[in-house]
From Swiss-Prot:
It is an enzyme of class 2 (transferase). Monomer. Keywords: ATP-binding, Cytoplasm, Glycolysis, Kinase, Nucleotide-binding, Transferase. The lineage of its organism: Bacteria, Pseudomonadati, Pseudomonadota, Gammaproteobacteria, Pasteurellales. This is Phosphoglycerate kinase. It catalyses: (2R)-3-phosphoglycerate + ATP = (2R)-3-phospho-glyceroyl phosphate + ADP. GO terms for molecular function: ADP binding; ATP binding; phosphoglycerate kinase activity. Substrate binds at D21, L22, N23, R36, H59, L60, G61, R62, R112, R145. Belongs to the phosphoglycerate kinase family.
Amino acid sequence: MSVIKMTDLDLAGKRVFIRADLNVPVKDGKVTSDARIRATIPTLKLALEKGAKVMVTSHLGRPTEGEFKPEDSLQPVVDYLKNAGFNVRLEQDYLNGVDVKDGEIVVLENVRVNKGEKKNDPELGKKYAALCDVFVMDAFGTAHRAQASTYGVAEFAPIACAGPLLAAELDALGKALKEPARPMVAIVGGSKVSTKLEVLNSLSKIADQIIVGGGIANTFIAAAGHNVGKSLYEADLIPVAKELAANTDIPVPVDVRVGLEFSETAAATEKAVNEVKDDESIFDIGDKSAEQLAEIIKNAKTVLWNGPVGVFEFPHFRKGTEIISHAIANSDAFSIAGGGDTLAAINLFGIADKISYISTGGGAFLEFVEGKVLPAVEILEKRAKN
């Protein structure tokens, strides 16, 4: 993917506008999960080291355009950066210009409060562009949205480039999907086939094997002719599951863990996949299945992981996801993981340092895997050509 990279540019004395993803959870004015801020800090440090006049902005939550409310403010992010040792201030009224001193970071208030942000109003894009000499797109998590701060500004800024985070994300996804080392194994979990159908279709053309988990696996179990009892599955997508299974190596679990109700205290019973009763629900794969899948992962050279294989939030139905998580962690394969539940599992099992690349994007990650063009990346490619 040919985009200009921030790392290659001379930024000395230049006004640099960084679109980051600082959309973090906030409670009582305090940041409760700082992962996205921590991921952005190296970009901010690099811009300062290069002698740039640094502005950074992001969306936060879902504010109403044109109506600023205190709970929509990036102030908690500013407080976090101050505590991390940065010379930083918040600018609320910036669309007509902002003065940035050497060595300081100016955080521009929540972009989604600006009228025209979401619909990519070109006039707003031009106002953002007028603030800078260089626009840096570093928010992979919003790269699938063509908005004024992700697309419009990139059209009109003198130079538009990819920040280190975005560049790393594109490199990692390209490595996993464009020319993967083989065998390539994809793990796709989640509650519904319908929400991951395009992902499954796209991966069926790339992966040597697809491991399915969660409610998705239940639909494949039903497609293989087994009773799934009261399990979450999609009867109308059984023909689709059969077609995918006929054209791709998708191993169906040989054993499962079932319960009588969806609750943390429900007793778990392990049994063969063909022994599920009408009043039971499948909430996890069994030990034999987990070990078989771990063996597949062990032999892989590329692993793409999106979604757990069971209800890992409940201790009784955690083991399948735990075994697979450790198989990925202990594998020599290039591994890339993405999606909220996947990140929660990675944190739960303490394996973050053993995954080659952890994607910061949810929807953008899935759309890239589906083979879709990400608008914010497309405009950077166009600008690189010109």
